[in-house]
Amino acid sequence: MRIIVVGAGKVGTALCRSLVEEKHDVILIEEKEEVLKRLSKRYDVMGFAGNGANFKILEQAEVSNCDVFIAMTDKDEVNMISAVLAKQMGAKETNCSRT
């Protein structure tokens, strides 16, 4: 499955690791470039630096082609907006969770 995760906190990072271990195609969107670079090197994930509620970032991550979109930043508004945008852009399943 093609899965997009927004947010690379403790839970987001653990989720990415588990999804990669299960052989999913994982795309990570994270605001902090240094965190994104570290995780992209450690795990087999494609990364996009930026705000998950930004339409252009979601377009770059090809949200319209994802099977599952999971927003799990520490900001409720980013989680809600990004999940709604992802659904409108064609994501098959969306989920938002506060970490």
Which residue ranges define each predicted feature?
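Cytosolic regulatory regions of ion transport systems
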Residues: 1-99
